[in-house]
């Protein structure tokens, strides 16, 4: 919906998305949390206590945080889709479901002692996965989200995300305000390159992975544009653009990103806290540039901004 031009396709797929959420809703308990979900509930290839064939821990009450967080994110996204097609009744339905589940997750899994979300109600095991999704779902915001994000990077007791799930980890770290460190998070991809791979392995175990070509590990392909160059959609069908560069130690960088109406071209030169940004948007597309807490307006065509 946010990036593509075929909005009719999005509308056609909404009924199917509703049915999928209805399936998971059948396993919700009175407090909204999921219990007894059948099948192989794969989350990530994690080789830590309590994980089994990619499936996260289930607590003594039969529930676990990852399935609950995925359902919460599904409700939140479904509300956006319903609002987009003008169905405010259904949007409110999903908002209400999300609000109940969000409160239940907070009560069941938040560890005040650890300052993190636990895998189960026992609050003994923790993961980058759960805390990434918690940030993305808005359970923690502002300074508290930043604190959780920093712990995900430093607390070695957390089960780590594999190369595939780092997509969500990095998205959460950026949302929490740590995006300027993005280039410091790419060690596993550098290991792949050092091994001579030209595609990405299935798991973070580069020496032992069964597959040397798994597209699910290719998140830098989008994050170089969305995080580093900071180009992102700000409206359905990419009708508006928000550009918020996170350059880290880089002084100069540029790139071109495909857009339904052409392409977005950027070139940045950073000098201390100052940024010179040459930005070209497709005709008829407007947007904003965000730098150092200030917002600058962008119009279709060429824009040159001296930001500080």
Which residue ranges define each predicted feature?
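Well-ordered alpha-helical scaffold segments within catalytic/enzyme domains
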Residues: 1-9, 70-88, 132-142, 168-177, ...
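Active-site acid/base region of carbohydrate-active enzymes
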Residues: 3-66, 82-131, 238
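Generic recognition of stable, solvent-exposed alpha-helical segments in well-folded globular domains
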Residues: 12-19, 66-80, 89, 93-100, ...
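Long, well-ordered core segments of solenoidal/helical folds
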Residues: 14-33, 96-115, 140-160, 177-196
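Charged/polar, low-hydrophobicity segments characteristic of intrinsically disordered regions
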Residues: 26-36, 107-116, 160-175, 197-209, ...
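Generic beta-strand/beta-sheet core signal
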Residues: 37, 120, 137, 170, ...
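Solvent-exposed loop and edge beta-strand segments that line ligand/cofactor-binding
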Residues: 52-70, 113-131, 137, 149-166, ...
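Non-catalytic C-terminal accessory modules of carbohydrate-active enzymes
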Residues: 96, 103, 180-308
